[in-house]
Regions:
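Non-heme di-metal
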Residues: 1-259
Length: 259
């Protein structure tokens, strides 16, 4: 029976599929973080500015880490097709802070920060949900596994600080509004995620040469997941679960010595 484990084995065994996966991760992380530097410029609170700037550096670092694996294969990162560009899909749905507001030099007010952190919390929750799956899929590649551990640790911190900032804003009388916005943004994000997932699965399964019925089944699963998210858009301002990180990957040289 076909399994998630087999899917990732097929990707790692196919140079073109692996290149496609790594390029999607590298470019996606870089694109997802590029606006954060400008967001930090809107901060009047120096402590908050430090947090947003660190978030920016983390996302750029993630893109660099995945690009390193891509270059080891002899490839450079390339732009994503619009159908595969998660951030462009979100922007098209009026999700989170608009590009126009990010480029506006005025400092963010409280309303701007609510919108920014709602969008950030929702997307970082998705990243936290996906990273363990990717990590399991890359377990046979120790270099990639170490990269995933580093990325996962950062992503947990990102969703934690976004949640904490929203909790502070909620304490100032915005709790009900934030909960409504979280539900709306989770539904919008689910739509963008579904669109990108279907496009990604279609492309990579064609590269892998999967039969039509398997490609159709995998894309149908994306639509089913989307409907589930619409019906159950998630909790409110609860803090993320503790202890979700796996044990770190062993260093390649230590793993080799143990064999």
């Amino acid at each position: 029976m076909f399994s998630e484990d087999q899917f990732f084995k097929d990707i790692l065994a196919n140079p073109e599929a692996k290149r496609f996966m790594l390029n999607s991760l590298s470019t996606g992380e870089t694109e997802g973080g590029k606006d954060l530097h400008r967001v930090a410029e809107h901060c009047v609170d120096p402590e908050l500015k430090v947090k947003v700037e660190r978030h920016f550096r983390d996302e750029i670092k993630h893109g660099v880490l995945f690009a390193k694996h891509l270059r080891a294969m002899g490839h450079e990162p390339t732009p994503l097709d619009p159908a595969l560009d998660y951030d462009k899909q979100l922007q098209a749905l009026d999700f989170g802070t608009s590009v126009a507001r990010i480029n506006d030099p005025r400092p963010f007010d409280e309303e701007d920060w609510i919108l920014f952190f709602v969008g950030s919390k929702v997307t970082e929750e998705t990243a936290n949900r996906d990273m363990p799956t990717l990590r399991r899929g890359f377990e046979s590649d120790l270099d990639l596994l170490q990269t995933m551990d580093e990325v996962m640790e950062d992503e947990v911190r990102h969703v934690t600080y976004a949640t904490e900032e929203l909790q502070r804003l909620a304490a100032r009388g915005h709790a009900e509004r934030i909960d409504r916005m979280l539900k709306r943004h989770r539904r919008l994000e689910a739509r963008a995620y579904r669109n990108v997932s279907v496009a990604f699965i279609d492309r990579i399964t064609r590269i892998l040469g999967y039969p039509f019925i398997l490609r159709w089944t995998m894309k149908t699963a994306c639509h089913v997941q989307y409907l589930w998210k619409l019906a159950f858009p998630g909790p409110g301002l609860e803090a993320p679960r503790a202890g979700i990180l796996p044990s770190p990957a062993p260093a390649p040289e230590k793993a080799a010595a143990a064999q």
